[in-house]
Structures are given as structure tokens and as C-alpha cells.
């Protein structure tokens, strides 16, 4: 049984995925986990592999969902990305980027491309 928070998260990820597909991205996988990290969506934008963090906030009066990706969360995402690339033997073979999709309770979507800088 899923908690209400998990259901809200799943719905936000589904909404983000549909939105990004309408923008031309292709779905690869979702909820890729490694140790303490998880990448919500992995998609492709032509020849670029896109790792996507989806953030939802019911109350966004004080802070936008996108602003909730902390430096610690960014480090975990990067470690998870590297594991994905190594596992699939893609390291140094494909261009990648990290995007963040923020969704508010009134379904406003903010998509930030290249939101997290990664240096290999």
C-alpha cells in the first residue's frame, strides 16, 4: 500500500513525464535507484541522455519546488547518474544533462534544463 505522499509523488512524476514527452523528449525509465539516491525520470532529448528530478510542492508561496533541490540532493543525484552510466556502459559515450521539473498544486510546471552542473 502506498502512502498519500508516495501517490502524490507518482502523480507528479507522471505529469512531468507527459509534459516532457509533449516537448519532444522520449521516455527511457523511471525511479532508477542506487544506494541513497534516486533519479525520478531518465529520458532522451535527441542524442542527449536527460536525468530529471521532479519536485512537487502543495504550498509554493514561500519557496518554489525547483529551489528545494539542495546541494546534498544534487550530490546524490550525480552519484546515481554515474552509477547508471557505468552500469549501462555509457560513461564517456553519450552527452548528458540534469533537468529539474517543478510542479505546484495548481499544476504550473517549470522546466529548467541543465539545472545541475556536472564535471567529469
From Swiss-Prot:
InterPro entries: Restrct_endonuc-II-like, tRNA_endonuc-like_dom_sf, UPF0102_YraN-like
Positions of transmembrane segments: none
GO MF entry, a single one: nucleic acid binding
SUPFAM superfamilies noted in UniProt: Restriction endonuclease-like
One Pfam family linked to the record: UPF0102
Family: Belongs to the UPF0102 family.
NCBIfam families named in the record: PRK12497.1-3, PRK14684.1, YraN family protein
Cross-referenced PANTHER family: UPF0102 PROTEIN YRAN
Name the UniProt record assigns to this protein: UPF0102 protein CbuK_0265
Lineage: Bacteria, Pseudomonadati, Pseudomonadota, Gammaproteobacteria, Legionellales
